[in-house]
A protein has these predicted regions:
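Sec/Tat signal peptide C-region and signal peptidase I cleavage site
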Residues: 17-21
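N-terminal secretory signal peptides that target proteins for export/translocation
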Residues: 1-4
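Mature N-terminal segment immediately following signal peptide/propeptide cleavage
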Residues: 28-63, 68-69
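Short, surface-exposed ligand-recognition loops at beta-strand->loop->(often short) alpha-helix junctions
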Residues: 38-43, 102-104, 192-198, 284-287
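Bacterial N-terminal signal peptides
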Residues: 6-16
Length: 332
């Protein structure tokens, strides 16, 4: 199959993300806003002190409700002390929470600065028969399959070394993305795995009022039958943390304001609960927890924790698709 034919096939069967696309109207429920990512750490204060180093323009160490914290825009990273290093995707079973990250105005320049600072880079393979690299733009362009890589090599195509995405390996093994977009450094996403991306998108929209951007997740659109379950996954592509490649599509995502819950597929399911792992859960806020909890109970959403005091406020914990834990905190 030629490069052109395979490329057309991949575009038809799967999708790439469409940044900040026009959005569908949000469901008519009380507003919920993205609030925080909660991590487990053997040294919360040291973990909180780390993030202002790579992201000095947007992150500051602070505290919130008794937790060591990082404030970045209107979002927080919170840290709970644990006795032993929490499991991540390298040391334990995979959860539905893959990583979180920042948009940066020049990701290659950021990567060079990270290396100069002595920060650990989580490298990726550029091909099944290739080498480890820092950034996606250090690989052949277009997130190619191995077949496409061989065809591009034969034609003399070279990496652009401009923009793209890469990853830091942060405190306790956290994976943190550095992805070029826009002109301002900002925390912008949590990246998820879901066995059925379209089903997850619909769940987030239905129960949490998230918006589904138009054009995102075209391959994750439901068929005429209305069945959101994934029947066909795209072939693996590179760069990839696994030398065997990474199945990227059908992908998708939803937004809470300017924060994206981005989704890649996890064929076969089996994702475990994130509780106690490196990223324990993420959270949204509501102005009236009683109203939100009552609605979610009417919708038969599973509760992991009933309403309880949360510092000077209140919170509850629910379970979403693929066992993801989502906290609902009250912010008046």
């Amino acid at each position: 199959m030629t490069l052109i034919i395979r490329t057309v096939f991949v575009i038809v069967v799967c999708v790439s993300f469409v940044a900040r696309a026009q959005e569908r109207p949000a469901s008519a429920i009380e507003p919920l806003r993205f609030h925080h990512v909660h991590l487990n750490s053997v040294d919360p204060a040291a973990a909180a002190a780390y993030y202002p180093k790579p992201f000095a323009a947007s992150a500051v160490a602070t505290t919130l409700n008794g937790f060591a914290a990082v404030k970045t825009g209107n979002v927080y990273l919170l840290f709970t002390r644990v006795a032993t290093t929490p499991q991540n995707e390298l040391t334990g079973p995979q959860t539905s929470i893959w990583h979180f990250g920042w948009n940066t105005p020049d990701s290659q320049a950021y990567d060079k600065r990270f290396r100069a600072m002595g920060l650990e880079i989580a490298q990726m393979w550029d091909a099944a028969d290739g080498k480890l690299v820092d950034m996606s733009s250090d690989t052949l362009p277009g997130l190619p399959t191995q077949e496409q890589i061989l065809e591009m090599r034969a034609k003399g195509v070279q990496p652009t070394h401009q923009g793209g995405f890469g990853y830091l390996r942060g405190p306790d093994g956290a994976m943190i993305e550095n992805a070029q977009a826009g002109t301002t450094e900002r925390f912008n996403h949590v990246h998820m795995y879901h066995e059925h991306p379209r089903c997850a998108m619909e769940w987030y929209a239905t129960h949490l009022g998230a918006t589904i951007p138009q054009g995102r997740g075209a391959a994750a659109e439901p068929p005429a039958t209305g069945d959101c379950h994934t029947k066909l996954y795209a072939p693996p592509t590179w760069p990839s943390f696994a030398k065997t490649g990474f199945v990227r599509d059908p992908s998708g995502g939803v937004n809470f304001g300017d924060i994206s819950i981005s989704i890649r597929p996890w064929p076969g399911g089996g994702l475990v609960s994130p509780r106690g792992k490196i990223v324990d859960h993420w959270a949204v806020s509501t102005a009236d927890l009683d109203v939100t909890v009552a609605r979610l109970k009417r919708e038969n959403v599973k509760f992991l924790e009933e309403m309880h005091p949360w510092g000077a406020s209140r919170a509850a914990m629910i379970e979403g698709p693929d066992r993801v834990a989502i906290e609902i905190v009250e912010v008046k």
